[in-house]
Amino acid sequence: MLLSDRDLRAEISAGRLGIDPFDDSMVQPSSVDVRLDSLFRVFNNTRYTHIDPAQRQDELTTLVEPAEGEPFVLHPGEFVLGSTLEVCSLPDDLAGRLEGKSSLGRLGLLTHSTAGFIDPGFNGHITLELSNVANLPITLWPGMKIGQLCLLRLSSAAEHPYGSSAVGSKYQGQRGPTPSKAYLNFAQS
């Protein structure tokens, strides 16, 4: 069941759902708007010949931050990682879906490529997979509304929520845009 604005406020007031910093004006009828942080991970296209998910490639991305008051410019066809300004903490009976903002989608900005699901128990900044499918550059301003977080109530609390040792949570507690840890999904020899 998708939570309404009333339910979202009740979960936040009860301290079960954490959104920090929280601004009540960001609550929509069935979601909470989230904003863009100031850190981005840019791919180093000349460092590797290809991306291999089975290999740890620490220098695949570089963390960049625009100067104070300046935007990050996302060029056509470019893909970077960003993150929400807000730290989100979900209880073990709520899951989240990050959706893009319609107004930004109409400009050609994709907020996530594939990973819009947030497991119950997750705590941290939500990493954004930002793509520009327009044919002009798009300026991304730190602090701008970038997406909306929808919350869904599970039929029962998760037995092993994200962050528990049983599920191998790679991104619990992440701060800022976090690079892929896909290599951990492969058997290590």
Swiss-Prot record:
Residues given in the record as dCTP binding sites: 101-106, 119, 127-129, 148, 162, 174
Enzyme nomenclature, EC number: 3.5.4.30
Site (Important for bifunctional activity): 116-117
Family named by the database record: Belongs to the dCTP deaminase family.
UniProt cross-references to HAMAP family, sorted A to Z: dCTP_deaminase
GO biological process entries: dUMP biosynthetic process; dUTP biosynthetic process; nucleobase-containing small molecule interconversion
Origin superkingdom: Bacteria
Active site (record annotation): 129 (proton donor/acceptor)
Catalytic activity: dCTP + 2 H2O = dUMP + NH4(+) + diphosphate
EC supergroup of this enzyme: hydrolase
Keyword Nucleotide-binding: yes
Involved pathway(s): Pyrimidine metabolism; dUMP biosynthesis; dUMP from dCTP: step 1/1
Protein name, per record: dCTP deaminase, dUMP-forming
Role noted for this protein: Bifunctional enzyme that catalyzes both the deamination of dCTP to dUTP and the hydrolysis of dUTP to dUMP without releasing the toxic dUTP intermediate.
UniProt keyword terms in alphabetical order: Hydrolase, Nucleotide metabolism, Nucleotide-binding
Signal peptide: none
InterPro entries for the chain: dCTP_deaminase, dUTPase-like_sf, dUTPase_trimeric
Stored SUPFAM superfamilies: dUTPase-like
Organism from which the protein derives: Rhodococcus jostii (strain RHA1)
Subunit architecture: Homotrimer.
Lineage summary: Bacteria, Bacillati, Actinomycetota, Actinomycetes, Mycobacteriales
An example molecular function term from Gene Ontology annotations: dCTP deaminase activity
